[in-house]
Amino acid sequence: MDGIKYAVFTDKSIRLLGKNQYTFNVESGSTRTEIKHWVELFFGVKVIAMNSHRLPGKVKRMGPILGHTMHYRRMIITLQPGYSIPPLRKKRT
């Protein structure tokens, strides 16, 4: 799946699991229809709603040089009742 980077595990995303909503970080250039298609194809579920927002990059400093990280996009995907995504593993750091 080129468009989906990884699942997000924050306090809010864990709370949303109870409402059958899953949170993913996705490629910034991906469209909503592409993400919906990939989720339905890969996980075998039916998507009824998608919300997205773009998170800004962070400012990083290395000595006198000031730079920033890239912004990224986060999607909150709501599934039809009766469908669920199998347990996702956390990304190890």
UniProtKB/Swiss-Prot annotation:
GO terms under biological process: translation
Domain of life: Eukaryota
Record keywords, A-Z: Chloroplast, Plastid, Ribonucleoprotein, Ribosomal protein, RNA-binding, rRNA-binding
Subcellular location: Plastid, Chloroplast
Cleaved signal peptide residues: none
GO MF annotation, one: structural constituent of ribosome
Ribonucleoprotein among keywords: yes
GO CC terms of this entry: chloroplast; chloroplast envelope; chloroplast stroma; plastid; ribonucleoprotein complex; ribosome
InterPro entries listed in its UniProt record: Nucleotide-bd_a/b_plait_sf, Ribosomal_uL23-like, Ribosomal_uL23/eL15/eS24_sf, Ribosomal_uL23_CS
UniProt similarity note: Belongs to the universal ribosomal protein uL23 family.
Purpose of the protein: Binds to 23S rRNA.
Assembly with partners or alone: Part of the 50S ribosomal subunit.
Protein name as it appears in the record: Large ribosomal subunit protein uL23cz/uL23cy
Organism: Arabidopsis thaliana
